Amino acid sequence: MAINRDYLGRAYELPEPYEVTRVKIREFADAISDPNPLYRDPAHAKEAGYTDVIAPPTFPIILSMEGAGQAIADPELALDFSRVVHGDQRFRYSRPLQAGDVVTCRTTITDIKSLAGNEMLTLESEIATTAGEHVVTSVTMLVVRGDAPSGT
């Protein structure tokens, strides 16, 4: 079944603002085995010009996957999750996320297309402070694998 193209432009929001904390940053840095002191040591981060520890560059995936998850879970989108693979991920930063930031995330379906028997779903997640300052845009492309050709 094809992805419902009527969903192009549909947006999903986090149910509440997300507080970026030192603990969450450290846990994420631990999970990706990154010992960078900018993610762990407030004094080191302040010496580098930040107000507190900063999050690793891929940290926003936590927020963008929430929006993507809402889209994927919508039965009317008609996306067969058993056939989904992650195709691409990009981040466009205005500045790093820092401990103490309280942010919102709005994920929008920006493209749906077919290519070589597969379908591609692109989602853009705009992450901003609750005061409206843009921090980062996360762009996720999911590939819904088509059926294998008959006889293979």
From Swiss-Prot:
One annotated GO biological process: fatty acid biosynthetic process
Highest taxon in the source lineage: Bacteria
Pfam family, one: FAS1_DH_region
Domain MaoC-like, residue spans: 7-116
GO molecular function: (3R)-hydroxyacyl-[acyl-carrier-protein] dehydratase activity
Homology family: Belongs to the UPF0336 family.
Name of the molecule in the record: UPF0336 protein Tfu_2666
Organism of provenance: Thermobifida fusca (strain YX)
